[in-house]
Every structure is written in structure tokens, then in C-alpha cells.
Amino acid sequence: MPLRAPGFWASGYRCTTCREVADAQAERNQLIALERHRASVLQALVQSCGTVEPVDYVALGYVETFFLYSALVAANAGWDDDRISPIDSHPGQLGATPDLTEHVYKTLHGAGIISPAPSSDPRAFSISDVDGSVDFSLRKVSWRLAPDVTGRSMSEVFALLLARLDDPEPEAVTQLWFMIAESECRKYFLKQCERYTYIKSDVYTVKVMDTVRSCLAHLSIGQMWNIIFYVLKDLAALSQEKTYARQHVYNMIPGNIRRYVDHRIGNDRPIHPWRRPSPATESWMSSILLDKVLGEGDSAFEELTGQSVGPSIGFRWRADGD
């Protein structure tokens, strides 16, 4: 008779049939526990959320309108009437980085436009043992849209959002441009970090982000990609020479970005913009902003700067008015 591990005999199951019965019972117990958790979540949601307040979608600000329209488009088949599937199940990227995608959903949730759907996978929720409050995973929960205050259907609300985007506000569009442009630059920065494997991705610090945003006032997204490419390329070479400690090289990134930009602009040297990525790799927010709101496509990526976005909207408005 073959030797068995001590735990085999201690378990009490000495044949295949017994083990199968035990496994089936364990699976049933898990399902029962899951159903109990779902019931607890539903009860806690009802107590904490109550009824969903209607929203006046006509009165939404331009940024909120853009956020909601982009979220619905990115959800694609995951949007059905007043339900939006979990972020992690969406086929494309809403924002260029996960941070931007989550910012959009947090903003919409904070404004009462969307709320967690009780029909979500119960494993997306957790209940506090202290006060019974409900917490949830932003990326794994399903969402429900608040009803329209005038009773519009969700397809009518979507048409309303679409029409609203065609009447852009220069200040709001400038805010969106900086937000999306910085996110696209962060994505490109992290991609270059993967190329130079000895540069850690977490070197994109708050200082680097602030520097990039400052430079974007004078540069297009494509031009900023050019700067990022050469800054990281030179610092990667410097890191390999081992002249400086690696952390010191990382700390040089914000200053080097500023110096590269100042040197090019100060000496009237052109900064050739990198080309816009293909639609297959671009985020939905970037595509909607560049193609629909700004209406300039590739040239908006390669030429528009933070300072020129607002005036370009005003020029379009005057041209359309004529």
C-alpha cells in the first residue's frame, strides 16, 4: 500500500468518492456564504443609499457632460439603459491611465450621476464591522445611472449629452485638455520606462507631473512626447555609466525636462511633434476631445498647446456663427 501524507488520514476521507462528496459540500457552503453576503450587501445598500435622486442632465456642467458621454461610449456594449458594467470589463480604455479613468467615475459618483448597482457581484462590496457602512471596488462594481428629472429615457439623455458637447466652453475644454494631455504624457513616459528596464515606473512623481503640466502650456502633446523621449534616453545612458547614483539620476528628471524645453524655446529651435498614436491604442477621452470637441484630429495632438486651446474654441465658435 502506498504511503500517504499525514494530512490524508487526518482528513478522514480515504477514497475518491468521499473526497468528491466533501468537495461538493464545500462548494455548496461557499455558494451559501456568497448568497448571505449578497443579502447583507443589498440590505446595507438600501439603508445607506436609499432611493436614487433624479438628475437634471440639462444642467450638467460641460466637464461632467464630457465625463459621462465618454464613460458611456467607452462602456460600449456594457452600457444597457440605466446600467453600466464594471470598468474592468470594458473593451477599451476610458482614460489614458487608470488614474484618469477612476477620477472620471469618482467625479460622476460624487455628483450623484451614477451609483453602485445592487445587482453587482457581491464580492465587489465590503461591509464595515464597525458601523455597517458599505464600501466597494471602483473597478469591479456595476453602476446604475440616476433617472432624468423630467423622465427622459437614457437614449434621450445620451442624445442630449451629444448635443451639449457640440457647444464647447473654452475654459472647460482647456481644463479637459490639460487633464487628458498630462495623462497621455504620463502613459508615454511609463512606456519609455518599460523600454529602459532599469528606469523604475514610479519615477513619475508629483514633481514630474507638475513639470509636464507646466510645459504643456507651451507645447503640444506630440511635442511633449519628443521632450520625454530624449530626456529619458539621455538619463538612461547616464545611469548606465554609473557616474551618478541611480536615485540621483531619477531626481534629475523634472529639472532636465525644464532645461530641454527652455533650451529649445530660448534658442528658437523647433520641437518636432511625435505622431498621434493609432485609434486602437488611444484612449476614448483623447479621441473624443481631439476629434469631436476640438474637431482638429491629428493636428490638435501635434500642434495645439495649453495656451492655444481656449482661443481655438473661440475661433471655431465665431467661424460657425458666421
What label would you give each PLM region?
Residues 7-10, 27-322:
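Basic, alpha-helical nucleic-acid-binding regions used in initiation and control of genome expression
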Residues 6-23:
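Cysteine-rich micro-motifs
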